[in-house]
């Protein structure tokens, strides 16, 4: 006997997600089910899926339950598990507000990348404490077709390779993941950002997200880009004691990234719930059969 399962759709700077509320972690969502739900032609469509679970009900999050009531069980569009999604956290927080679980102000969200602090502003913007960036040593190159560029290795809880280019079109169609060297630099894959300057402390980027392809926005990617650009510009807030703020344009909008002197990075941008409904469990079972 089939049942109806609630879902919502939301986006943060057009990085869009299927949202599945499941407070008690009762649903079985294997990778194939997530991929089917995120399919833009045969499913609901999304760059990824936000599985909304109480931290105490999820084995990966129970250790964070004292700090954060809710766990963002994030999945990429192909069904693979991801450590963190910056735009996803903002949309996750907006959903919690939409559902009446939280109000404007501060809250904590558990993720595989740790507990993230979130602030929901009166104007609708959501600010997320993204943690600190790690800058692993070692030279990395990325390439598309015959073009190749040196890249800055930045880790935001997930790996990023940031390449500065003369023209964003040089990245091509980004249907396939850009190549990287050395081949063993990212054993679990990497998110690749291509960046151009737009003005003082203002850049634009395109991104190929591992497991999802090119997306309209990537929050952790925008943070990685801001940090890489600051270092290229000779700015290190830990050394100067002055925050470094960059405006980062993505195809789906604009994010504002601030790196504080203590190393913490804050990302501010919009988050929107656009629809809600139900899907039939029998459909999903048929897809998985």
Swiss-Prot record:
Its main location: cytoplasm. It is found in: Cytoplasm. Its EC number is 5.1.1.7. The keyword Isomerase applies. It catalyses: (2S,6S)-2,6-diaminopimelate = meso-2,6-diaminopimelate. InterPro entries: DAP_epimerase_AS (IPR018510), DAP_epimerase_DapF (IPR001653). Catalyzes the stereoinversion of LL-2,6-diaminopimelate (L,L-DAP) to meso-diaminopimelate (meso-DAP), a precursor of L-lysine and an essential component of the bacterial peptidoglycan. Belongs to the diaminopimelate epimerase family. This is Diaminopimelate epimerase. It comes from Streptomyces coelicolor (strain ATCC BAA-471 / A3(2) / M145).
């Amino acid at each position: 006997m089939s049942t109806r399962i609630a879902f919502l759709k939301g986006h943060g700077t057009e990085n869009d997600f299927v949202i599945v509320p499941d407070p008690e972690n009762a649903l079985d969502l294997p990778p194939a089910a997530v991929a089917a739900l995120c399919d833009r032609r045969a499913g609901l469509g999304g760059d990824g899926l936000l599985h909304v679970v109480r931290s105490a009900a999820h084995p990966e999050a129970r250790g964070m339950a004292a700090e954060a009531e809710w766990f963002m069980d994030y999945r990429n569009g192909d069904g693979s598990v991801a450590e963190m999604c910056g735009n996803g956290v903002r949309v996750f927080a907006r959903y919690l507000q939409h559902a009446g679980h939280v109000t404007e102000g501060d809250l904590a969200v558990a993720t595989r990348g740790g507990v993230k602090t979130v602030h929901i502003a009166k104007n609708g913007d959501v600010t997320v404490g993204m943690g600190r960036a790690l800058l692993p040593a070692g030279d990395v190159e990325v390439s598309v077709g015959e073009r190749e560029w040196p890249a800055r290795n930045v880790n935001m809880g997930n790996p990023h390779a940031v390449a500065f280019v003369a023209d964003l079109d040089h990245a091509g169609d980004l249907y396939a993941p850009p190549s990287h060297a050395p081949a063993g630099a990212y054993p679990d894959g990497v998110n690749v950002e291509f960046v151009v300057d737009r003005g003082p402390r203002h850049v634009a980027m395109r991104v190929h997200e591992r497991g999802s392809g090119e997306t309209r926005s990537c929050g952790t990617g925008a943070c990685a880009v801001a940090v890489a650009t600051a270092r290229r510009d000779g700015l290190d807030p830990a050394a100067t004691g002055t925050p470094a703020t960059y405006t980062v344009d993505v195809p789906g909008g604009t994010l504002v990234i601030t790196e504080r002197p203590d190393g913490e990075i804050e990302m501010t941008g919009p988050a929107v719930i656009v629809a809600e409904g139900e899907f039939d469990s029998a459909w999903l079972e048929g897809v998985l059969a």
